Amino acid sequence: MFQEGAAFGTSMDILANMDTYDQNVWGCYVVANACFWFASLSCHAVDTFCPGLEKTQGQKSHMTQRTFAHAAAVAFANIVICAAAVVPGGANLWRALHAAPLGVGNAFHPPREALVLAGSLLVIDFWFYWTHRAMHHSSIYRAIHKMHHRFTAPTAVAAVYAHPVEFLVGNVGGVALGPILCNAHPYTAWAWFAVSLLSTCGSHSGYAALGADKHDEHHRLFDCNFGVGPFCDSLFKTRKEDIPKFANKPHPMDRFRPGKDGKRA
């Protein structure tokens, strides 16, 4: 009992001795990990115990236990170890940009934080879209991005199955830059990280109900649907329906879905 109390007290002392910048960024790290592992393990449990549920690319997107363990190990290396290594850098960037950070003790103003969220959405849409497209360039793809495309029909844990460079530049950069640039209140930053991690797990889950359709088509067709936001793919004409060779390409599950007349396609 004494040792447990001492450990808890030490943890509180460490947190109390951090400045606001470090508290905010480490909070983002903890929230991101909690949401990622919750979503990944939950989706894997559904895959394992409810294998008959329809997936966007059919049942081939179910991982074996061995493949899941491998993907989870890579995810652990990225989101636990690599992400922790860059937390000080995130805090330092926040420190360099804003002399007066907002902490948990500061008042939360919803109108301001709504603008912060809007700004963060614009940042991640632009940042992820262009870093992702760059990763598809022939000079970079084989060395870095090909690893993420190992799974043409991914599941949630594959959301951060990536080369560390891609993970840190594209994934972490895209999610973290918005709250840092906009000097988000920590509650906003933590909520943004939670939504971002749950969203990326959903988009890799293979379940249409979790938002997998758009990004799953990217993994299947490769040269479309690069973005995660609502703007860049539309603006730069890289949606599946904007590209002639893909526009009328049937979805692999179409034969199991109702057609326009309500009958099976």
Q: Language-model features: where?
A:
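Cytosolic/stromal cytosol-facing helical appendages immediately following the last transmembrane segment
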Residues: 1-26, 30, 39-64, 68, ...
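Hydrophobic alpha-helical membrane-embedded segments
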Residues: 31-48, 82-87, 120-131, 199
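Juxtamembrane helix-loop-helix connectors linking adjacent transmembrane helices
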Residues: 57, 84-124
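Interfacial transmembrane-helix boundary/kink motif in multi-pass membrane proteins
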Residues: 58-79, 104-116
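Select subsegments of transmembrane alpha-helices in polytopic membrane proteins
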Residues: 70-86, 159-167
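Alpha-helical transmembrane segments and their membrane-interface junctions
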Residues: 79-98, 170-181
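Membrane-interface loops
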Residues: 100-107, 123-153
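Membrane-embedded alpha-helical segments that form the functional core of polytopic membrane enzymes
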Residues: 109-129, 133, 189-202
